Amino acid sequence: MNTPIIDFSHPLPAETTTPAADRLIDGDPRQTVANYFADPSQQFFAGRWSSSPGKWRIRYSESEFCCLMTGRVVLQNLAGDRWEFGPGAGFVVPAGFEGTWEVLEDCTKFYAIFEART
């Protein structure tokens, strides 16, 4: 079997989105997402995501590895613990995380997401 490597340097059409109105806290973030890979089970995904500044509520049912390429972001959990990341930072948001995601300056990240079927 000859399975190709997925190369993120090749441009893909991106989908433009915004956070749901009931989750938006501040700003008018515009987001683009280009999903480069989905496994046959549809439980694992990888791609590129970008956003303009804003802040919104998040509730993760999936686990996500992020590698921030540009910009600055802040994640804060419901207990008030805060994590700030800049270019080159890698981090995991585990399934079950609840809090906020804030983009301080235009950012781009690569992501890998696993969402177990229930």
Question: Where are the regions that the model predicts?
Answer:
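Short acidic-glycine-tyrosine-enriched beta hairpin
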Residues: 79-95
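Short hydrophobic/aromatic-rich beta-strand segments that constitute the beta-sheet cores
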Residues: 58, 75, 109-111
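Short, surface-exposed charged micro-motifs
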Residues: 35, 65, 90, 100
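Short, conserved beta-strand element in jelly-roll/cupin
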Residues: 60-75
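Conserved short histidine dyad/triad with adjacent acidic residue
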Residues: 42-60, 94-95, 117
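Ligand-binding loop in jelly-roll beta-barrel domains
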Residues: 95-118
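Short histidine-centered beta-strand/loop micro-motifs
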Residues: 35-38, 47-48, 56-61, 77, ...
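A short, N-terminal "cap"/entry segment at the start of jelly-roll beta-barrel domains
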Residues: 1-43
